[in-house]
Amino acid sequence: KKYLMICSALLAFPAMAQDTYENARLLGNDLNGTARYVGMGGAMEALGADLSTIRTNPAGIGLFRKSGVNFSLGVVSQANANAKLDHSATKLSFDQIGFYRTMRTGQTSYVNFAFNFSKGTNFNYFLAAADHLNNASLGKQAYLKGMRGSLSNGGYSIGTGSGSNVDTYYGYIDNSSNNIARNYGQLDYLYWNTRLVDKNTPSLFGYDAANGYDFNRSQRGYIGNYDFNISGNVNDRVYLGLTLGLRTVNYKGYSEYVENLVNASNTAIGTATITDERKVKGTGFDLSAGVIFRPVEESPFRIGLSINSPSWYDLKTENYTTIQNDGQNQGKWEHGKSSEVY
């Protein structure tokens, strides 16, 4: 058997699209927190007196008059989970735990300290899909991009490397450039160096179409929010708060994609299998401040205002992608591997 392996961190493979895709996982937050907060749909920025407002409006912690502890559990359930990827249908989720400490500073004034852990995003998820393909394939897509000849035409120019990479195919900006085209990614590399180049005649390019596919993806992990708060009130009318938030990111995903290959007569000739394992780890932080004002002393009516900074992250992404060439019209290699770290 012949094998192909590359560590693309050593090459100029573009990671912009993948980087944007991975960062999109960090956007937004799940509705997690105390039972009261979740039951109210998170609309408690002006009400306060709930640990989960520690991020949305830190002044809400200033309404507490007694110290306390709070924790919440949740259940993540997804039907038709796939045992093949070791993904169970139901998982217990520890969503929130925290405490608050109150200190009286006057007859109607307090200074409070609080800490709260919550899951900002729960990544536990499974997806399975299968359908027909009308003579399309990922190999066909990579082939057509190579035939366009340049980045300006929506593709790239296929050529070999130099030195120890003289037998390796790359997609360049055009036929006069030594720079890798930004649309030449890991899958393009794997296909051009496993399936699209004839093993006996390297100058002959070709692809196999497919009439169906099977796709499975399993992902796990979460974004952990660790929030530290100081807050208080002035004469039980004005409530102020400040929160420092620390974030931890722990994501792991695995996907498997299988195409059923066919020849020009629509006869099955094997499969092409792509697997991808991806990890994202890192830390981040943000700041938030808030105020709640009770304009009428005899009324519980309150007005809340808060400001939240963006979250700054320092992330490390690793991925490992393979292709298994099990078609009859095998190309140059039977198996390919590619990894990236950024």
Model-based region annotation:
Residues 39-52, 83-86, 213-219:
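Asp/Glu-centered strand-loop micro-motifs enriched in Gly/Pro and often flanked by an aromatic residue
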Residues 1-22:
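Bacterial Sec-dependent N-terminal signal peptides
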Residues 18-32, 37-38, 95, 102-342:
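Outer-membrane beta-barrel porins/channels
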Residues 19-44, 61-79:
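Transmembrane beta-strand segments of Gram-negative outer membrane beta-barrel proteins
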Residues 12-13, 68, 247:
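Single-residue recognition of alpha-helix boundary sites
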Residues 2-7, 41-53, 238-241:
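Short charge-dense sequence patches
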Residues 49-103:
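Long, well-ordered hydrophobic secondary-structure segments characteristic of membrane-embedded
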